[in-house]
């Protein structure tokens, strides 16, 4: 851990660093990381219904989790959204849509001018909190109204079964589950980070990524078994802002934006979970899709380097305060 991450340095006694993460797929798609299978070789590949299911989806299939909260959540929304893509990886694949994660939504605001900014090399900090899309994005569609829709759906299902029509049973299960989650008090409470103290919210950071990690801790406390977070956001709804892909301006990006943001919210999560005893049975994984080139390019950036990267494992099931592996001259 470098000098630009002093808060994270205080938490490393909870962690294990693996310095030999390697694979063959030079792409931003997290497919191989989340499924364990060979990923797409083209960076723009979107998910397909024939893909292998993600780890979170398999956990749902196994019935792990608690009633009343989503078992699998991805924040701030679908991976790749900042570039207009839906990258393969976190979905249910051939298991079906009902094993997809619950994708949150968000509306970023900025506390500095964004006019003329190149979000890829000089991104502004996005501020937002993850939202439940169906309830927060549609005015007037509150919990009571959704509850009435759920009751109506149940009545229609009963009539259909009496008539022997089972053609849409799987869709009915999916719809009922979605309605139950969206009307669940436990779900809405878990996403309500305003219930946290002001000092806690400021410790995580009021930016998008701090808000997402605070919501993640609340979800895990409520019984959610798998939470994913992609460090990316949108600027003007078109350009990515905040992702870790420094092909240019690498050193200023790390010093002024990427590392301070990560240092604040990641260390807050680890310290908070440790203080609550949650690291005993929760694994926190910090990683990227690949490493970055040892050589600096002409734009003062580092390009993709799948040959070697690192992963930080924190919490349950790992040997704490340990470093594994080392790179070689190649």
Task: Report each predicted region and the residues it spans.
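Ligand-binding pockets and gating/stacking loops
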Residues: 1-330
């Amino acid at each position: 851990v470098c000098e630009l991450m002093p808060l994270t340095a205080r938490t490393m006694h909870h962690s294990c660093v693996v310095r030999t993460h390697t694979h063959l797929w030079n792409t931003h798609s997290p497919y191989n990381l989340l499924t364990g299978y060979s990923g797409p070789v083209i960076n723009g590949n979107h998910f397909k219904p024939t893909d292998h299911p993600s780890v979170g989806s398999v956990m749902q299939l196994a019935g792990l989790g608690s009633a009343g909260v989503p078992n699998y959540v991805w924040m701030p929304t679908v991976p790749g959204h900042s570039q207009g893509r839906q990258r393969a990886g976190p979905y249910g694949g051939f298991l079906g849509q009902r094993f997809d994660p619950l994708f949150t939504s968000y509306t970023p605001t900025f506390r500095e001018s964004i006019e003329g900014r190149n979000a890829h090399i000089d991104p502004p900090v996005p501020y937002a909190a993850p939202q439940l899309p169906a309830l927060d994005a549609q005015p007037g569609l509150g919990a009571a109204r959704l509850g009435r829709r759920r009751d109506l759906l149940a009545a229609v299902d009963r009539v259909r079964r009496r008539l022997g029509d089972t053609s849409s049973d799987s869709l009915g299960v999916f719809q009922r589950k979605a309605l139950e989650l969206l009307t669940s008090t436990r779900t809405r409470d878990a996403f309500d980070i305003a219930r946290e103290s002001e000092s806690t919210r400021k410790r995580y950071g009021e930016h998008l990524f701090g808000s997402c990690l605070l919501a993640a801790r609340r979800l895990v406390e409520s019984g959610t078994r798998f939470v994913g977070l992609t460090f990316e956001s949108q600027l003007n709804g078109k350009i990515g802002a905040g992702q870790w892909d420094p092909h240019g301006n690498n050193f200023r990006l790390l010093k002024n934006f990427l590392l301070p943001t990560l240092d604040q919210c990641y260390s807050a999560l680890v310290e908070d979970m440790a203080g609550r005893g949650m690291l005993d049975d929760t694994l926190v994984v910090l990683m990227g899709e690949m490493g970055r080139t040892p050589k600096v390019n002409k734009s003062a950036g580092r390009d993709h380097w799948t040959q070697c990267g690192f992963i930080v494992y924190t919490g349950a099931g790992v040997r704490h305060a340990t470093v594994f592996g080392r790179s070689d001259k190649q």
